[in-house]
Structure formats: C-alpha cells, structure tokens
C-alpha cells in the first residue's frame, strides 16, 4: 500500500501531489476523522467543514506570514475567473477606469485581453516579439492614473519567471502567482491582491486562493457578479456560494505537507536544485536541447525546451516523448500553442524524479549526437 508510485508526473497543472497526501486522502475518503461521512458529502456549513476551511486559511497565513490587514478567500473559476474578477473589483478604484498590465507570456496576455472588457488597459512596454524575457522595468511606462498594475509571476507556457517584485511607485500591485505560489517566500505586504489556482503547487483543481488587502474591498463595479466580488466573499468567509469543499480540504493537506517539509524557504532551495539540474543539461548539450528563455528570466517551475535545434525537430521530439512514456515519465509535452517539451517541477516533484529525467535526457543526447 505504501510503496511509492513508479510513475513520474511532470504535469503543468493539475500536477503531482505528494504521495503522503494522496495516502491521507485515501485513508479519510470514506470516513473523515470518524464523523461517518466523506468530505465529498459534507455540508459546507457544518462545524467539521468550518474546521477544514479555517485550518487551510490559517496555514496560508502562517506559511506566507500574511499581515492581519489582508483577507484570504477561496473562490471558484480558476485563474481565468480572476482575469475577470481583478478588473471587476479594482478597476473602479480610480475614476478613469484604467489599469497597467505587464505582458510576459500567454497568461498575462489573456488577463490583459479580458480586462479590456471593463476599462482602458495600458501595456506598460512595447509588445514583445517573443515571450523569452522580462522587459527591463526601467523602460516600463506606468500610468500614474492606473487603478492597479498587474503581472504574472511565472508564465507556465513560456517558462518566464520574475525573480523580483516590481517597484510600481506605490500603485496597487496585483499578481497572478498560480504557478509559483508557495514555491518561495513572498513579502505579501508589497501586494494589493495575490491570486493562485491550487492545482500546480498547493493542491488539486477547483479552488483559487485570493489574498486581498482590506482597503481594496468595496470598489467593485456595479455589474460585478456577487460570486466574484471580494467584499461579498470575504464578508461571508468564502461561503457566499457553496465552496469547492474537497479542493479546500486537499489544499489544507498539501499546505500541512509544505509546513512539515520546511515551508516556503525549503521549497525554494529544492526548486533551485531541481531546475538547475535540468538547465545544466540543456546548456551543456551543444545546442541539442534549446531553452529559448533568457537565462536571467528562466522559470524554476516550468522548463520549456526544443530538441535538435531552436525550432525543434518534430521526429526527435516525438521519439523523446515516446521513450519518456516507456520509462513512466508523464506529461512532458509542451503546451499546444508552442509545442516542444516542457518539464514542470512543482513542489511535489522530488529531486529523485528530476534525476530520472536528467539521466534520460543525458542518455537521449548520447544516442542522437552525431
């Protein structure tokens, strides 16, 4: 029963969960802590579920040292729901209904496009020819009248990650941290809003955690749906509508696992070791493996690369994926919009998992070098 799974899951999200968490879920699935029912069938207004959601919130607060003047809420709709919720809640902070967006990849581009429905959106830098770097912040053209400045901390499709918090001159800073949430410590006080879908680093699909500063509540546009309104959800302790109870429970278990394994700082150390292992193989492959991202902006979470040359050799990449599958390594195919290969190294992916991939990459390189 306790034998580790032989399959290695490099999925970009939903992603691997810690094995011990899966065993805990399995153990409690039919009868949660002796109450006689599963969390799957538990009333969201019961005292048992109140303990679950309070525990999950407290762990978020503890692991990120969330200041007291921030609310932590659990919503549905994923990151895409927040692409709408952010402007609906915040674009009315200033009369001009405008916002600044930093667009460094597919997800921030999507967020900016969605926000255009609700106001004027200023992309703070010239459009990038390719998503392979973060434009130098000294070149950003921030609008002093913007209600907020938005960026995505880690772009899962293109493998671009911020290793700094942008200085936005006192403006309200909003961050999509879906794919590097709790992979490293973060100074929450520098942000107005942080949101993250759980299904990458902190749980299973279905719940999105939103951390919002108290003074930003109450400015939603009149047309904002109540389920997306931060003030309504915070005022109802995330119970305005039936929340994704099971996903919140799973998230609590994963947060407990992160805490027991040294917290965000320990996750950061592991992320550096794991990502460095793969980037070193890519960089020492004499151009056989190619990562298009500028070294200083490379993601520790998602490593996209091509095989054979910078544009990718389709036959080689197919062979790589087929062989990886034979070795029980799953979900290494790049996002459909960019192709190639992508290894996602979220918190639950172990150093041993990464070493298996590294050994395979070295062997594949040896087999195909001229």
From Swiss-Prot:
Q: Which residues bind O-phospho-L-serine?
A: 44-45, 335-336, 342
Identify the PROSITE patterns for this entry: AA_TRANSFER_CLASS_5
Coiled-coil region list: none
Protein known as: Phosphoserine aminotransferase
The yes or no answer to whether the keyword Transferase is present is: yes
Region forming the signal peptide: none
- What's noted on cofactor binding? Binds 2 pyridoxal phosphate molecules per dimer, each cofactor is bound at the monomer-monomer interface and forms contacts with residues from both chains.
Native organism taxonomy: Eukaryota, Metazoa, Chordata, Craniata, Vertebrata
What are the protein's GO molecular function terms? identical protein binding; O-phospho-L-serine:2-oxoglutarate aminotransferase activity; pyridoxal phosphate binding
- Residues that the record marks as modified (N6-(pyridoxal phosphate)lysine) are 200
Names of the cofactor(s): pyridoxal 5'-phosphate
Q: What is the effect of changing residue 155 to Q?
A: In NLS2; uncertain significance
Q: Which gene encodes it?
A: PSAT1
- Tree of life domain: Eukaryota
Task: Report the outcome of residue 179 to L.
Answer: In NLS2; loss of O-phospho-L-serine:2-oxoglutarate aminotransferase activity; loss of function in L-serine biosynthesis shown through in vitro reconstruction of the phosphorylated pathway
What family is reported? Answer: Belongs to the class-V pyridoxal-phosphate-dependent aminotransferase family. SerC subfamily.
UniProt keyword terms in alphabetical order: Acetylation, Amino-acid biosynthesis, Aminotransferase, Disease variant, Phosphoprotein, Pyridoxal phosphate, Serine biosynthesis, Transferase
């Amino acid at each position: 029963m306790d034998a580790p799974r032989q399959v290695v899951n490099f999925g970009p999200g939903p992603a691997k969960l810690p094995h011990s968490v899966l065993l805990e879920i399995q153990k409690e699935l039919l009868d949660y802590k002796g109450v006689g029912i599963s969390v799957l069938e538990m009333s969201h207004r019961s005292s048992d579920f109140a303990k679950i959601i309070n525990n999950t919130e407290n762990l978020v607060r503890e692991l990120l040292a969330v200041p007291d003047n921030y609310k932590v809420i659990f919503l549905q709709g994923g990151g895409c729901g927040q692409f709408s919720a952010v402007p609906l809640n915040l674009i009315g902070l200033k009369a001009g209904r405008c916002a600044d967006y930093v667009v460094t990849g597919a997800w921030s581009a999507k967020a900016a496009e969605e926000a255009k429905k609700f106001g004027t959106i200023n992309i703070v830098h010239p459009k990038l020819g390719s998503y392979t770097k973060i434009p130098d912040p000294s070149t950003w053209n921030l609008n002093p009248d913007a209600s907020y400045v938005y960026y995505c901390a880690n772009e899962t499709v293109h493998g671009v990650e911020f290793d700094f918090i942008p200085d936005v001159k006192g403006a309200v800073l909003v961050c999509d941290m879906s794919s590097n949430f709790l992979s490293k410590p973060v100074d929450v006080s520098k942000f107005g809003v942080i949101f993250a879908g759980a299904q990458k680093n902190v749980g299973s699909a279905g719940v999105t955690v939103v951390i919002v500063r108290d003074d930003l509540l109450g400015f939603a546009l009149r047309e904002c749906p109540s389920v997306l309104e931060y003030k309504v959800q915070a005022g109802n302790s995330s119970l305005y509508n039936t929340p994704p109870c099971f996903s919140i429970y799973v998230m609590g278990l994963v947060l407990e696992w992160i805490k027991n394994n040294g917290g965000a700082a320990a996750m950061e150390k592991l992320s550096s070791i794991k990502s460095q292992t793969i980037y070193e193989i890519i960089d020492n492959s004499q151009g056989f493996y190619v990562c298009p991202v500028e070294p200083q902006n490379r993601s520790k979470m998602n490593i996209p690369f091509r095989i054979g040359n910078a544009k990718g050799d389709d036959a080689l990449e197919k062979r790589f994926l087929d062989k990886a599958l034979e070795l029980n390594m799953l979900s290494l195919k790049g996002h459909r919009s960019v192709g190639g290969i992508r290894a996602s190294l979220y918190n639950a992916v172990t150093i041993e998992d990464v070493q298996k991939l590294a050994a395979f990459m070295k062997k594949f390189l040896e087999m195909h070098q001229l």
